[in-house]
Amino acid sequence: DVGAGKGPVRREVVRIVTPGTLTEEALLNDRQDNLLLAVHRLDTDWGLAALDLSAGRFCVQQVTTSEALLGEIQRLQPAEIIVNEAVVLPTELAADTRLHNQPAWLFETDSARRQLHEQFGTRDLAGFGCAALPAAIGAAGGLLQYVANTQRTALPHIRSLSVENRSDSLVLDAATRRNLELEQATSGNLRHTLVGVLDRTATAMGGRLLRRWIHRPLRDQAVLEQRLQCTGALIDRDCHTGINASLRGCADIERILSRIALKSARPRDLSGLRDSLALLPDLDAQLSSIADPLINRLSAELDRHAGTHALLQCAIRETPPVLLRDGGVIAAGYAADLDEL
C-alpha cells in the first residue's frame, strides 16, 4: 500500500512479456493464433505442447521422427519455442531464432504430470487422452511452468488440453504448404492464397478457426459430411445471411475472456463482451429454426448468460474509455459511493 507508511515503495516484477505470451489486443493479429510451443524429447519420442494464452487453447502431441517434428512446427508457426536444454535438436530447429532453452528439470515427467494435475484439478490425465504420452506430458508441464514463471498469476482459463494425432489429418510437409500457398503466396499478397479466397468469416475467432482447419485438413469423412450437411442446411433455408450479419457485431470474446481471467482486461473489453452477449438471444432464435443435427446441438448448448449481460449492462457505461485510469468506466447509478465522487 503506497500510503501505508514512509520510505521507498516496494517494486516487483509483475509480468515478463515474451512473444509467445502476448494477450494485448494491439500486439496481436486478430486472425492468427499466437502460440507458445514447448518441445521435449524422451528416448525416441518428441513431445510437443502448444498454448495460445490469449485464447486458452492448449494441445499436445507426440511424434517419433525429426521430420514429423519439423513438419508440425511449420504447421503451427509458433511465436516462441521453448526447449529442454539437455535435448539435442535437429539442425534446422537449433538455428531457429524463436528458440529459448529452458532447464531440463522443467520437463521432468513426474513433476510435469503433477503440474498438469494441479492446473486441471484432476488425479490423472486419462480423461484427456495423454496419460500414455510421457514426452508430450513433459512438454506440457514445462510449458505451464514457463508461463507461470513469466505471467506471475494463475491461469484459470486453461481448463483442459486436447491431443492431436497426425493420423487424423492429411500430413503436409513444409514444401507442400509453400507450393499450395495456403496462407503465404510467392507474390506476398494474401488475396492470392487459399485463406484469402475462402476467408469470409464474420468474426476474428472464426478467421482463426478457419486457418487451423486449412492447415490441418481432416481425414474423418463422417465429420466432413456432417459439416457439409450443416452448410447445406444454412444455405437452403437462407439463414446464413442473417446469422452472418449478427455475428459481425460480435467482439473477440475468446481473447476478451482470457484477458479477464488473467486480470488484464480493459474497460472496452467489458463493453465488447456486454454487446456480444446482447446478440445471443437473436442468434439462438435463428439457430433454433434450422433442422440440422449439428446446429441443433449447438443451439442446445448455447447459454445466453443473461445474468452476466444484465450486470455489465447496468455497471459499464455505454462507451467507456480505453484505459481504466481515465475514469468514467462505471455507469451512473450503479454505485452510490462512486456517484458522490
Where are these regions (language model features)?
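Charged catalytic and DNA/RNA-contacting regions of genome-maintenance
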Residues: 1-233, 241, 245-261, 265-341
